[in-house]
Swiss-Prot record:
Mn(2+) 2 binds at D745, N777, H830, H909. Binds 2 manganese ions per subunit. It is an enzyme of class 3 (hydrolase). Residues 553-563 have a biased composition (Basic and acidic residues). The keyword Manganese applies. GO terms for molecular function: metal ion binding; protein serine/threonine phosphatase activity. This is Serine/threonine-protein phosphatase BSL2 homolog. It catalyses: O-phospho-L-seryl-[protein] + H2O = L-seryl-[protein] + phosphate; O-phospho-L-threonyl-[protein] + H2O = L-threonyl-[protein] + phosphate. PANTHER family: SERINE/THREONINE-PROTEIN PHOSPHATASE BSL3, SERINE_THREONINE-PROTEIN PHOSPHATASE BSL2 HOMOLOG. Kelch repeats lie at residues 136-182, 240-288, 293-344, 349-396, 417-463. GO terms for cellular component: nucleus.
Length: 1009
């Protein structure tokens, strides 16, 4: 193999005719020339669908922000005086190394917490020839490969301290000009060149999850990119490792290789991207934006000419990858530079031009602002390439840019801070650590939110055309908590602190709404009809479960749906040993969890003197505890994940959804029923949420304070009312100091299932540690095919798009966690414990993704069972929902709490008239958050607010009277209302608890249990 024993420091043969700045235009597949836009006219970056695939309004918003305020220039750097215990802890002088940011491990303040770190690996520590003289040609001094290292150094950002790591395991060989990227808390190393020539193509992983770091060599099947150096690598979409270009010892390359980290066995796949990509080159940089867009910047081509253009690479939903030229005019060509994203801004530093020359002065630091579609240097927006050098003493000159005049250095970002280490300047190796802060990061985020909101409105009005795709059916696979001294959880004493409007308290009798005297409306007769359709839907699934049990299949090893990218949740060892602490069957909840003696209620009136009034009612006024309403299970006809054209915009889908829908006070039902997201965006949102859900356990471990929500069933207006009255999950609301837990049944029955589920998923992606979702019985294809969600998807998105969306959502539902433990004292689930669940470990052992028909009786009981009519009915009884389902008595509740050292079960699943209902002497609470369920129940909706002191406060809203004029009176809405009414008439919910049951429901028979 023709490999030099050294790498020249700059260009092997230079040319003064450096490539000029990259062209403008939209960031899409139709951009094929480098002609710039009019000077100062920014364009936003998207991908995969033409010059301007994202909404024009969003582009205009970004451009407007750029014109009014102007994108911030590139920041200046300062030297960091880092500490180290001994000299060898510091990396020292070196170049050709890598610097990789690794996120924090654990919760800050908790034992074992490790803050964000920078991991420096390898590089060369010496030069060939006379290091005092800068090299000028191919025959002059270069990196001395005998001085290449395999050292690992760690910079702790929080403590500002360097240390040298000594990992166990088999380390990579010494090397420089290699690549590295982070995959979670692991650093992946590949390629490079060392004393023995080109390094092998093996992937080496430095695992930092344990206290003692460890090297692993990843086993990869089949052919790969082969040995090379001067190439680039990045993790795209938190999934695909992409390796591009470099030099194989003979020539520069332009090939693209991908490794799917979610598919085992691992294998490299050579990609053939469409569109105009970069020429064969080496010493470029590649950085991945958070939404999955990769930007390749600069480099040196086969003629040793430095390149100026930047290229974006994106993956379409149909599996295609596509190159597109980034907009804007680069201030300078460069190679052997460093680049890293901070939000939507790509920070580029240093670089060489060849012939001993480096990028200097204002152009030595540059930013590609992908929100505005422009390049900036330290002076201003760049409209023409900088051909000359700024004088250090000229007006506005900044001598600090001399710090960044270097090449062969490395950069990484932690939050809004950009770090640069080492490199080469004038033939001298550097050992300094630099830092800069991107002050524009917050502004970019705000601009993105604003643009997203405008884009959402534009989409609704214009009706965006979905991307190309096809589908087919395929079976796929926190803060410290203050508790009471004895550590117990408590159901109620002092009044919890008011939230938002709660300070307007009115407890006068004339304003109180007495729940026990509520009159039965016409809807009662309608609700009394047994829901035969729901019984049929669930009975088939239950029969399949029983058949498997008869055939001897283990309940704790349910069949799971599998997909190429499915990662099963970890199965924990079951321990069915009872804890020492036990509750007696006749006990009341011990000091610990307490139900507050007053519930907070919002007046039902929409206006007038009582409009929006909040008052508190005694819990004793909610004594009618036998009034629940019911409804409907699943064959999982899920579609294979199809890859649709994706728009690469910094206005990420979650931000767009939140900006469009999270309007607690101002949301109104859309006049047009067409949903504002297309399939591309639905797929993006589901992909992001699925990555989070798949990493969570089946039983979440949560901390107080927390708000708990019951069934929502597509009643998005009620969700907004609850957010308006009792706080919303946003930075302007209370997300910073209280978590949110939703107990399932997000879709079906109501008219806005799409709004409900997409907002909750967006909130989960935006606040993954603060917003928690578990699965309900309607999060299953068999059920939501019958009770509204499927027909809503088709009605609002068209048949093809709607069916695809319905399939994709149901595939996501199979990943949802199944229960949540709060402070190890309260367990939250959707249905109940039924006949089979005696220990929490049984739920923990359910592996996901899981479908209802592949699940066990444990899953059926968890999602479908109910408490008996009242505390006097013990044991197990048939359930009116359908054959094979059960209700469980207060003795089962007490036994379960005894077995698991728990004090309270919070569950949803049943429409209770007051929004919440106590059972088993207060050891179980049923929670329902949608009001006037199915338009007939006239029930209140409620949430539970659990404080740090473990006091539970119910907070209620009542049904609103119908508005006199609203968008709902439009002809389009009349059609929508007709199909929803017909659906509910054909598939009525189960009657309220305590009301007359259908004659054919033999609730006394135990023969089939």
């Amino acid at each position: 193999m023709d490999v030099d024993s050294r790498m020249t420091t700059e260009s092997d043969s230079d040319s003064d005719a450096a490539a000029q700045g990259g062209g403008g235009g939209g960031f899409g597949s139709e951009t094929s020339s480098a002609s710039p836009s009019a000077p100062g006219t920014p364009t936003a970056m998207g991908a995969g669908g033409g010059a301007a695939p994202i909404a024009a309004a969003a582009i205009a918003a970004a451009a407007s922000a750029a014109v009014v305020a102007g994108p911030r220039p590139a920041p200046g750097y300062t030297v960091v005086n880092a500490a180290m215990e001994k000299k060898e802890d510091g990396p020292g002088c070196r170049c050709g190394h890598t610097l990789t940011a690794v996120p924090a491990v654990g919760e800050e303040g908790a034992p074992g917490y490790v803050g964000p770190r920078l991991i420096l690996f390898g590089g060369a520590t010496a030069l060939e020839g006379n290091s005092a003289t800068p090299p000028s040609s191919a025959g002059s001094a270069g990196i001395r490969l005998a001085g290449a290292t395999a050292d690992v150094h760690c910079y702790d950002v929080s403590s500002n301290k360097w240390s040298r790591l000594t990992p166990v395991g088999e380390p990579p060989s010494p090397r420089a000009a290699h690549v590295a990227t982070a995959v979670g808390t692991m650093v992946v190393i590949q390629g490079g060149i060392g004393p023995a020539g080109l390094s092998a193509e093996d992937l080496h992983v430095l695992d930092l999850t344990q206290q003692r770091p460890r090297w692993h060599r990843v086993v990869v099947q089949g052919p790969g990119p082969g040995p090379r150096y001067g190439h680039v690598m990045a993790l795209v979409g938190q999934r695909f490792l992409l390796t591009i270009g470099g030099n194989d010892g003979k020539r520069p390359l332009a090939d693209v290789w991908a490794l799917d980290t979610a598919a085992k066995p691992y294998e490299w796949r050579k990609l053939e991207p469409e569109g105009e990509g970069p020429p064969p080159c080496m010493y470029a940089t590649a950085s991945a934006r958070s939404d999955g867009l990769l930007l390749l910047c600069g480099g040196r081509d086969a003629n040793s000419v430095p390149l100026a253009s930047a290229y974006g690479l994106a993956k379409h939903r149909d599996g295609r990858w596509e190159w597109a030229i980034a907009p804007g005019v680069s201030p300078s060509p460069r190679y052997q530079h460093a680049a890293v994203f901070v939000n939507a801004r790509l920070h580029v530093s240093g670089g060489a031009l060849g012939g001993g020359r480096m990028v200097e002065d204002s152009s030595s630091v540059a930013v590609l602002d992908t929100a505005a579609g422009v390049w900036c240097d330290t002076k201003s927006v760049v409209t023409t390439p900088r051909t000359g050098r700024y004088s250090a003493d000229a007006a506005g000159g900044d001598a600090s840019v001399e710090l960044t005049r270097r090449c062969r250095h490395a950069a990484a970002a932690v939050g809004d801070m950009i770090y640069v280490y080492g490199g080469l300047r004038g033939g001298v190796l550097l050992d300094d650590l630099l830092v800069a802060e991107d002050l524009a990061a917050a502004e970019t985020t705000n601009a993105a939110n604003q643009a997203a909101a405008i884009a959402a409105a534009s989409d609704i009005q214009a009706g965006r055309e979905p991307g190309r795709y096809a589908y087919n059916d395929e079976q796929t696979g926190q803060p410290a908590t203050i508790t009471s001294p004895d550590g117990a959880v408590v159901l109620g004493t002092p009044v919890a602190a008011p939230v938002n409007g709660d300070m307007y308290t009115d407890i006068s009798p004339e304003n109180a709404v007495i729940q026990g005297q509520r009159r039965m409306s016409k809807g009662v007769d309608y609700l009394v009809e047994a829901s035969a359709a729901e019984a049929e839907a669930i009975s088939a699934t239950l029969a399949a479960v029983k058949a498997r049990q008869v055939n001897g299949e283990a309940e704790h090893s349910p069949d799971r749906e599998q997909s190429p990218d499915a990662t099963p949740s970890v199965k924990q060892n079951a321990s069915l040993i009872k804890p020492d602490y036990a509750l007696s069957n006749n006990s009341t909840p011990p000091p610990g969890v307490r139900l507050h003696h007053r519930a907070v209620v919002v007046a039902a009136e929409t206006g007038g003197a009582l409009g929006g009034m909040v008052r508190q009612l005694s819990i004793d006024q909610f004594e009618n505890e036998g009034r629940r309403v019911i409804y409907g299970t699943p064959e999982s006809a899920t579609a294979a994940r199809k890859l649709l054209d994706r728009q690469m915009s910094i206005n990420s889908v979650p931000k767009k959804v939140i900006a469009s829908l999270l309007k607690p006070r101002g949301w109104k039902p859309p006049v047009r029923r067409q949903f504002f997201l297309d399939c591309n965006e639905i797929a993006d949102l589901c992909d992001s949420a699925e990555r989070i859900f798949s990493s969570e356990p089946s039983v979440l471990q949560l901390k107080a304070p927390i708000k708990i929500f019951g069934d929502l069933h597509g009643q998005f207006g009620d969700l907004m009312r609850l957010f308006d009255e009792y706080g919303a999950p946003s930075t302007a609301g209370d997300i910073a100091y209280i978590d949110y837990l939703f107990l399932g049944d997000y879709v079906d029955r109501g008219q806005h299932s799409l709004e409900t589920i997409t907002l909750l998923l967006a909130l989960k992606v935006e606040y993954p540690l603060n917003v928690h979702l578990i699965r309900g019985n309607h999060e299953a294809a068999d059920i939501n095919a019958l009770f509204g969600f499927r027909i809503e998807c088709i009605e609002r998105m068209g048949e093809r798009d709607g069916i695809w969306t319905w399939h994709r959502m149901n595939r996501l539902f199979n990943w949802l966690p199944l229960a949540a433990l709060i402070e190890k004292k309260i367990i939250c689930m959707h249905g109940g414990i039924g006949r089979s669940i005696n220990h929490v470990e049984q739920i923990e052992n359910l592996q996901r993704p899981i479908t209802m028909e592949a699940g066990s009786v444990v899953l059926m009981d968890l999602l479908w069972s109910d408490p008996t009519e009242n505390d006097s009915v013990e044991g197990l009884r048939p359930n009116a929902r359908g054959p094979g389902l059960v209700t469980f008595g207060p003795d089962r509740v007490m036994e379960f709490c005894n077995n698991n050292d728990l004090q309270l079960i919070v569950r949803a699943h049943e429409c209770v008239m007051d929004g919440f209902e106590r059972f088993a002497q207060g050891h179980l609470i049923t929670l329902f958050s949608a009001t006037n369920y199915c338009g007939t129940a006239n029930n209140a909706g409620a949430i539970l607010v659990l404080g740090r002191d473990l006091v539970v406060v119910p907070k209620l809203i009542h049904p609103l009277p119908p508005a006199i004029t609203s968008p709902e009176t439009s002809p389009e809405h009349h059609l929508e209302d007709t199909w929803m009414q017909e659906l509910n008439a054909n598939r009525p919910p189960t009657p309220t608890r305590g009301r007359p049951q259908a004659a054919n429901n033999d609730r006394g028979s135990l023969a089939w249990i």
